[in-house]
């Protein structure tokens, strides 16, 4: 807990302090600081090119290339997946990534002074992604706290993003899927995002897939 707080909070407070100092000196400097930090914390390019390249490969009939790109994106083997499964998993990854790299970052940017919220969310997500699921003796406690802290920080943004999906898509189906299907996912946040996103888009996500020769229920 202390290690996580020391890693996240000082940087967050320092970011806010720089914003206030620059704004006091010149509002334009504060604005430029906001823009710079927000630009660095947004990660649109970290997922958009994967999604675009995968769908382009599928359209060109290059299933092997699409499979390789998906495996690289997800960090696990995509061997055995057919074109339909690849497209579905790419959509799932894109929905979750759009939230974690764009929508949630912007929301926290708005909630806290200056760009401090955006930086806090990005740091929390970084530690969750790299240590949140580790259970070894050296990093296990840090990983567990990183996971819990990120879940708390992400609680409100997840639901706002899901509501946004519903508003811009099929509202009734999105809300219905959110209420009835999200609880089936082991990852609550991903379940809410994928259920509401699937309902809004009118597609089916979260179906069983074949990974490493075995059927994975999700």
Predicted regions located by residue number:
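Hydrophobic N-terminal alpha-helices or hydrophobic patches in metabolic proteins across all domains
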Residues: 1-218
